[in-house]
Amino acid sequence: MRSDMIKKGFDKAPHRSLLKATGLKDEDFDKPFIAICNSFIEIIPGHKHLNEFGKLVKEAVRAAGMVPFEFNTIGVDDGIAMGHIGMRYSLPSREIIADSVETVVNAHWFDGMICIPNCDKITPGMMMAALRINIPTVFVSGGPMAAGKTSKGEVVDLSSVFEGVGAYQSGKISEEELKDIEDHGCPSCGSCSGMFTANSMNCLCEVLGLALPGNGSILAIDPRREELIKQAAEKLKILIERDIKPRDIVTEEAIDDAFALDMAMGGSTNTVLHTLALAQEAGLDYDMNRIDAVSRRVPHLCKVSPASNWHMEDIDRAGGISAILKEMSRKEGVLHLDRITATGQTLRENIAHAEIQDKEVIHSLENPHSEEGGLRILKGNLAKDGAVIKSGATEVKRFEGPCVIFNSQDEALAGIMLGKVKKGDVVVIRYEGPRGGPGMPEMLAPTSAIAGMGLGADVALLTDGRFSGASRGISVGHISPEAAAGGTIALLEQGDIVCIDVEERLLEVRVSDEELEKRKKGWKRPEPKVKTGWLGRYAQMVTSANTGAVLKIPNFD
């Protein structure tokens, strides 16, 4: 066993003595040591219940004849961090999480790991660590939150609350109505109830094969979560016995399938960023062109909030992720069904008995929302290395208009609230990329303000930053190269005409190459917004969004 490094041999007497101080007995040294990587944090509603989850996981691990050791990671609640400097720490926290898990697991030579994530950056951070460490691992997330209902019976979620701010600001609803939405938008523990980033990543974790069937859709408050925990411990023991590791599971084909599900469900654009980062950790050569190829062959079968009024509980009721995958498998070439997963079985075996229970929620191949996926990769002279749009969250497929430029999210939000943006405009928010932000903050507040003011179909928004999974409308993010790297977005001037063509996958500014080259010669990179602390270091090390915004390792040659 891997853990023999710290528990076998006469020279490990000091190690065993320390381990006995934690409560271990001599007989425990013949059992696998299992890391329970938890993320219990009281300020994050998606993680508030994970303390109890951790106890259940440890009980299940002991029942399976193994020895559990629980530790915790940090986390950031993107909703609470939204709209201020806290959001700049969100994406960088992914790297800290990955590094901290690597540190604890490799320092103590665990034989296997069960990860308990739930929200936005915690799930991908732990997944990156699992691929980096590469010991048998199973994920069990905390589960989605239920949708809420206002006093009038209207179904609401966190996206409704953000959009309610814009609606109140523009006089569309009263303060009392806003308070009603606020009070009911987040009714329980769990990851926010729509197809936002957290749920998108937990669903992708399931199809990648790192989590068990049901992981993405079973609600946090559903007793079936406890059964999932028991299964996770049992399956982990099998993975250890068969020496099946994350890199055996997360192959190029598995990433294809993850993006295929993403396209079928119209997931968060953040999945592109995080899954590209996973590919980097797995040592795979996977780029945005391959994502685009997946998008072209996968139909859009589900619309979940913010693209509709359906929520994760509806997906679960309609058959869950397995039912979506089973339907997708009917189309040749969409999925790789014979690859291994954390169940110890193939994807084909995992979904064999799944069926769609409600075709209003999960559409059939014969009745898709669209013939192509709910996310699209755009390219053009404004995004030579690519950009991402959640095409399933807007009915507008082509938009052209003059750009209104803001050099920060705060500046943009103030401008939107002051009425500086009108119908037909293209809002540009730049210098908010991985390096320029720093931290590539999400633009939920501006997109929600635009939607809440009734301009969601009449105003486009472009950024080198990110969008929350709760964002909707004509929102193009992850523009690469970013402004801080001298990308074309940095060269735009007020009033330049920008064209977004979703069907043709184009993002262009109507300015000649000669004029852009002239502007570039006169461009100067702004001073970094942050020069000290973690964000200062992050800004110096982070790479582009089109490679997952991972950190580059300095060249010591």
UniProtKB/Swiss-Prot annotation:
One of its GO terms (biological process) is L-valine biosynthetic process. It holds the Pfam family ILVD_EDD_N. The active site is at 468 (proton acceptor). [2Fe-2S] cluster binds at residues 119, 192. GO terms for molecular function: 2 iron, 2 sulfur cluster binding; dihydroxy-acid dehydratase activity; magnesium ion binding. The keyword Transport does not apply. Its EC number is 4.2.1.9. Belongs to the IlvD/Edd family. Functions in the biosynthesis of branched-chain amino acids. Catalyzes the dehydration of (2R,3R)-2,3-dihydroxy-3-methylpentanoate (2,3-dihydroxy-3-methylvalerate) into 2-oxo-3-methylpentanoate (2-oxo-3-methylvalerate) and of (2R)-2,3-dihydroxy-3-methylbutanoate (2,3-dihydroxyisovalerate) into 2-oxo-3-methylbutanoate (2-oxoisovalerate), the penultimate precursor to L-isoleucine and L-valine, respectively. HAMAP family: IlvD. This is Dihydroxy-acid dehydratase. It comes from Bacillus mycoides (strain KBAB4).
